[in-house]
Amino acid sequence: MVKCMKPGKAVILLQGRYTGKKAVIVKSFDDGTVEKKYGHCLVAGLKKYPSKVIRKDSAKKTAKKSRVKCFFKVINYQHVMPTRYTLDLDLKNVVSADAISSKDKKVTALKEAKAKFEERFKTGKNRWFFTKLRF
């Protein structure tokens, strides 16, 4: 069987608090682990998407509208839908299973991930990932 849940693949979450949000797979566990015996993956996604910027907005307002909020989550393969898109964003050294467990590591990891997502948004790459899913 071909493994389609590879790191860098953009997915849409189907269950939980972040239902309908877009995320990118950071690390996949196809055979499971000791704690979770099913296939799952560590994802980093967008909790809050950037707003639409118009020409007459000031620089301050444009900066505010370009902000994103992100999240990390370990999620079952059954609860994600893979897309055809990939994000070549290197979050492997930022996000780890150990960063999720402790509060202070998670806060620093979230800040680093937020900076990477915002930088990617400002360069204009992967436009689809930064638009809200309409349904």
From Swiss-Prot:
Q: Which cysteines are joined by disulfide bonds?
A: none
Q: Does the record carry Nucleus as a key word?
A: no
Q: Which UniProt keywords apply?
A: Ribonucleoprotein, Ribosomal protein
Look up keyword NADP and say if it applies.
no
Instruction: List the GO biological process terms.
Output: translation
Q: Which GO terms describe its molecular function?
A: structural constituent of ribosome
Q: Cross-referenced PROSITE patterns, in alphabetical order?
A: RIBOSOMAL_L27E
Q: Name one GO cellular component term.
A: cytosolic large ribosomal subunit
Family label: Belongs to the eukaryotic ribosomal protein eL27 family.
The name this protein carries in UniProt is: Large ribosomal subunit protein eL27z
User: Which lineage ranks, top first, belong to the organism behind this chain?
Assistant: Eukaryota, Viridiplantae, Streptophyta, Embryophyta, Tracheophyta
Which gene is this protein's source?
Answer: RPL27A
